[in-house]
Amino acid sequence: MASVKVAVRVRPMNRREKDLEAKFIIQMEKSKTTITNLKIPEGGTGDSGRERTKTFTYDFSFYSADTKSPDYVSQEMVFKTLGTDVVKSAFEGYNACVFAYGQTGSGKSYTMMGNSGDSGLIPRICEALFSRINETTRWDEASFRTEVSYLEIYNERVRDLLRRKSSKTFNLRVREHPKEGPYVEDLSKHLVQNYSDVEELMDAGNINRTTAATGMNDVSSRSHAIFTIKFTQAKFDAEMPCETVSKIHLVDLAGSERADATGATGVRLKEGGNINKSLVTLGNVISALADLSQDAANPLVKKKQVFVPYRDSVLTWLLKDSLGGNSKTIMIATISPADVNYGETLSTLRYANRAKNIINKPTINEDANVKLIRELRAEIARLKTLLAQGNQIALLDSPTALSMEEKLHQNEARVQELTKEWTNKWNETQNILKEQTLALRKEGIGVVLDSELPHLIGIDDDLLSTGIILYHLKEGQTYVGREDASTEQDIVLHGLDLESEHCVFENAGGTVTLIPLRGSQCSVNGVQIVDATQLNQGAVILLGRTNMFRFNHPKEAAKLREKRKSGLLSSFSLSMTDLSKSCENLSAVMLYNPGLEFERQQREELEKLESKRKLIEEMEEKQKSDKAELERMQQEVETRRKETEIVQRQIRKQEESLKRRSFHIENKLKDLLAEKERFEEERLREQQGLEQQRRQEEESLFRIREELRKLQELNSHEQAEKVQIFQELDRLHQEQNAQSAKLRLEKRRLEEEEKEQVQRVAHLEEQLRKRQDTAPLLCPGEAQRAQEEKRELESIREALLQAKEMRAGGDHTCRDELERAQQYFLEFKRRQLVKLASLEKDLVQQKDLLSKEVQEEKVALEHVKCDAGGDPSFLATDDGNILGGPPDLDKIKTAETRLQSREHQLQDLLQNHLPALLEEKQRVLDALDSGVLGLDTTLCQVEKEVGEKEEQIAQYQANASQLQQLRATFEFTANVARQEEKVRRKEKEILESQEKQQREALEQAVAKLEQRRSALQRCSTLDLEIQEQRQKLGSLHTSEWSGWQASLETDGEALEMDPARLEHEIHQLKQKICEVDGVQRPHHGILEGQAVLSSLPPSGGNSHLAPLMDARISAYIEEEVQRRLHDLHRAIGDANHTPADVMKSNEELHNGTTQRKLKYERMYSRSLGTNRDDLKDPIKISIPRYVLCGQGKDEHFEFEVKISVLDETWTVFRRYSRFREMHKTLKLKYAELAALEFPPKKLFGNKDERVVAERRTHLEKYLREFFSVMLQSETSPLHINKVGLTLSKHTICEFSPFFKKGVFDYSSHGTG
């Protein structure tokens, strides 16, 4: 067992951190790493001091932040410290794993892969591995087989980096072998012979790896890469076979990243999410393994069941053996030294600290047969030791010695057999490894490659070519082309005039045909072909201008060899390309003259050979020239490529320079914009100051001009007053006459208003009488019947609840209790049906009686009208009214009133009482037809009926109280009318006396003025005194007259306001009567009553406004009476009242009036001061927080519900059960609420903070949707068209007691 080795490496600061002026927060001393939190002030003691610096101890701490530091650790030192252990473990037969962990841009890829000038761990480990392999192979100590694979995990999908592009790039699946563990299906494995092969594959994989630029790293790895080396070694150690298989996982992880720091969006954001998901799973695996290791270290502690979530991520699944399994694992935590990355760095250090506690179980992975051989040899040695220790003579004779010796021989034979089998298998493996799919055989000093399939052998005149290229032509079609073809080619070639899809070799039953594609250049034996051509043994094929091959057909060659042995063919013909022609004509020629023919053919063949040799030489020369041209062109391409690279590097440098310059320019632009904004603000402030100063100057100038104008007016006024004194006398006479006429008109108007008031009171009395006529239709026993039925239903409910409790307690007698309760309920329904039938019969009789009375009243009314029509004393006026004797007219009105009353009663009976009774009877019949129901159903039905009975009883009580209130209101209105009449009579007397006094005073004043004016005219010496007296007299008259005029205007306004006020009060009383009329309807007409009420105006449509209406009427009447009495006293001019007394009485009167107004405004402002625009969103509700209440078993959470209705706001505290009760109750009344999603009840976790926080959000959403539905529902009392401007806190509380603030709701410690 071995723990995971953990190393921490800190990188230098990058350009981004330097631009942010980040501080260095990492210190390393030997194996200790310390991180400092600069946000906590230095010098703190206690917890704050400990929180400022945190120190961790690891196996290794690599300080690579400063190359000039003596403690600087280079790539080479990291390899010597960690990489040599990996190579050593691999040669010992252990699995090994190295992975780097850290945030994005912390140096993971640099540590693992390095760069072109400074290789990382992966290249150095591979190089060291093959260096040791070569050293071992040189001394023939062992043989090795090495396979590599390279994959990446991108967006939780596995991709093979060493496979050429195809449609299955990301479709590799991860599976798990029961013994070998997780593996990737169809992952390509590549045999390598040396480090250059590994380096080539590694470079190819790195090119295919997914990288992108983010806000924190220009070349950020967007995937996890795993480079795996499967290393097999076999050798004989002291004649003991030894075979071990090691897997080395070299992992380069992508970095964890925050979206706000990297600025990732779109694809980058999705990649970052998948990267973080796999890294979080890796952290969870590390934590779980650390917990398991700690439990294993403490055997006395009870072990916990810890689940390790390997399969939550593809990364952790593939590294299952490396984390807590059969592997020697090294974790390298890479961190940033900057304070801007403090959180990520601390998280990385904590994960690394947890990883130290993981315990792995590495074992040597040896072959099963080798292990068995080793165990058998150990057993043989033990048996030989036993035989050598005992008495040889005694043991040889005993049966035990014979059995031991026999077992010894069996084991030795088995060891030899297994050793031979293992040696043959390994040698065969090595031969297959060397020979691949070809058969090698030695012929003299040469080596012959044999193959059974048709194949092509490359003819290459490249001076640097040292190998032989052989391509098999499989059964079917073999495609030849370039690497950039749209489809994958079986044979990939390069050269001049070679098309991307050049040709096809078709092998059909041993016959091979060459098919050129789209006019490609193909030659067979020097002849250009354009159509499909069959190939024969030895054919020379030229594809393009530089790719030449020889076609070999083993089966055809074997047939030709057989024919040559039989003497049918010459030895020369087998080596030339015109073999087919010779085969066709040879038989006939040989039969004609075999000897001469042979000599002739030999000469022809020699000539042909010579010509072909020359042709080949020419072709070779041409090929050399073409090759030289190709090399020249390649050199030119290489030169241009290098120049392109130089230009690209310059472009990158220029781009970086442009980026830096643009960054500086942006910063300068930002500074300039900020300076411009400051300048604009200062300029605006200066402009505002100047504007304010200009306004002040204009105001002062305006005031000066006004003062000047006033002075001028005053001067002119003083001049004009002298002239107006004499004109005032004439005007006083005229105004006296006009005022007298106005007072007479006021008297006449008061008399008319008195008549109208009397008529209104009579009309109100008539409406009250109609309402009283309708009231007898209500059966007096209805309330008593409802009370009795409620008591019976409550007893049934108690019985059902008792049966339910007995059933929950497991009592076996609960069934009998349930049956008795249900039978009692059915008996109650039967009695109720009998009562309803009796009521129905009474109502039918009452309907017949009312119908009969209506007919009689109609007949009587007709008789009265006929009698009145024949009387000549009745005269018809222009407007159609009948004027006659008062007794006859009273009879007609009385008869019409009785007829309307009876018709109204009959209509109310037919439309409301009778249908409601039939509906209730039908419900009882349905309940009886359904028979005995379940406990819960019966209990629910009983609960519903109890609620209905309670509503009926409350409705009856409200009807009675409202009828009584209506009567009291009528009496009060009649009293008010009588008081108004007295006030008007008193006002008439006051006006008459006032007019008389005013007339006398004016006459005396005019007489005095006339006398004094005549005296002034006679005596010129007294002009100044007369002028002064005139001014005094004029001022006196002016003040007196203005006082009288103001008094008269006040009286006139009061008199003008009286009809409007009285008319408004009568209108309010009418609305109230209509409201009471709607509420007085019986319980089975509730819905119809609500519909009628909803059609009334908003100001009088709700019954809860009745107290406000009474208070308003009382306040206005009291105010008017007090004002008129005060005016009366002031008009009389009581001599006993001093000015101080008058002011005191006025103040008292004003205070009383003000108090009454304030009282009324407080009571009625909510229903009158609302704007229509506020009804767009009248109710706002939220749950800002929740509190923990109670102790022990009663501990629970309560939610603070904040309700705002227009300008009223209040708060209640409710627990979750109250929400659920309200939802269940209102859902039965309003079907629309059933569609709302209510947060479900949970059996566990009700006291968990996360559950409560989530429930708070759901409840808040539910309440908002709840009010939205109720405001739009036609059946809801909160419908916006019904409540209108009267929507208030009172309306919401009446709708449901859930929103009513109770006694314990004034703090957060209520019971909810």
Swiss-Prot record:
Domain PX: 1177-1291
SS bonds (residue pairs): none
Modified residues (Phosphoserine): S398, S582, S838, S1047, S1145
UniProt subcellular location: Cytoplasm, Cytoskeleton; Early endosome membrane; Cytoplasm; Cytoplasm, Cytoskeleton, Spindle
Lyase in keyword set: no
Modification sites for Phosphothreonine: T577
Keyword Membrane attached: yes
Function description: Plus end-directed microtubule-dependent motor protein involved in endosome transport and receptor recycling and degradation. Regulates the plus end motility of early endosomes and the balance between recycling and degradation of receptors such as EGF receptor (EGFR) and FGF receptor (FGFR). Regulates the Golgi to endosome transport of FGFR-containing vesicles during early development, a key process for developing basement membrane and epiblast and primitive endoderm lineages during early postimplantation development.
Family, per entry: Belongs to the TRAFAC class myosin-kinesin ATPase superfamily. Kinesin family.
Name this protein carries in UniProt: Kinesin-like protein KIF16B
Species, as recorded: Mus musculus
